[in-house]
């Protein structure tokens, strides 16, 4: 008997090797299995479709388990669709998950709003971000930083980088160790011509907590900032490369540094 988590991992692995279509095929096959088992249980049969007797409690527990597994597969398919930049497929899956997994609605609306921005639909993004607030826990239990990030994303989509920087400055004061805030705040500072401030912000985070902040997106943006700041960018990139070697190893895609042969 192969554990479900292992089957899901096997289905996801091709995505990490750049074989997204193969991953989607495997994940969809796994989703069909989940759907068939749920259908069998709803029709009064056992999981495998036989007439094996099950108590009501056993059936309810099994349905709950397989619905949860179905959601896990749908989340994986969504991630794969985003990697393929198939934002419409990802959006339709998230909308289905909102209906089926209402406890996760706030986070799902946040993700859906970001997808709307990827599609260039700022109005839909704003409406979706409003849904995030409606489904979040009431103050003081919800995270105010997430709402500020949403506002900043909308400003960035409208090329209002100065406004976005001001919003992200507020978010940074609330949570100075939030990687999304640091990365986006740095980018906005860069686009408003405050490159030195952007470098100080992002570089400070990377060197103070490399295990936490050495992400490819952050490193890529930092490399761009170095290139804009001075002709000494290569040496600074090498310092980041050394940090990556110490804390991340071979799994890190060093192409993010944009190193050129000297």
Task: Give the positions of each predicted feature.
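Helix-rich alpha-solenoid scaffolding regions
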Residues: 1-18
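Flexible helix-coil transition and linker loops at the boundaries of alpha-helical arrays
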Residues: 1, 35-67, 97-102, 135-141
């Amino acid at each position: 008997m192969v554990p479900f988590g292992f089957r899901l991992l096997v289905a996801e692995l091709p995505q990490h090797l750049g074989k997204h279509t193969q991953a989607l095929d495997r994940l969809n096959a796994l989703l069909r299995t989940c759907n068939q088992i749920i259908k069998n249980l709803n029709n009064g049969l056992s999981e495998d479709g036989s007439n094996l007797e099950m108590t009501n409690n056993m059936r309810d527990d099994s349905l709950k388990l397989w619905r949860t597994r179905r959601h896990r597969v749908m989340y994986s398919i969504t991630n794969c669709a985003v990697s393929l930049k198939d934002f419409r497929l990802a959006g339709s899956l998230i909308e289905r998950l909102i209906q089926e997994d209402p406890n996760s609605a706030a986070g799902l609306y946040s993700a859906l709003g970001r997808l709307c921005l990827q599609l260039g639909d700022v109005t839909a993004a704003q409406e979706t971000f409003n849904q995030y607030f409606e489904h979040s826990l009431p103050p003081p239990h919800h995270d105010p930083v997430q709402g500020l990030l949403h506002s900043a994303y909308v400003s960035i989509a409208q090329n209002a980088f100065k406004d976005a920087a001001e919003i992200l400055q507020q978010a940074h004061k609330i949570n100075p160790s939030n990687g999304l805030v640091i990365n986006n705040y740095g980018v906005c500072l860069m686009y408003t011509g405050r490159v030195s401030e952007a470098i100080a912000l992002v570089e400070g985070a990377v060197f103070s907590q490399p295990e936490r902040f050495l992400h490819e997106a952050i490193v890529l943006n930092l490399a761009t900032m170095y290139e804009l700041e001075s002709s000494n960018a290569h040496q600074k990139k090498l310092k980041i490369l050394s940090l990556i070697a110490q804390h991340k190893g071979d799994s890190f895609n060093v192409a993010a540094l944009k190193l050129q042969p000297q």
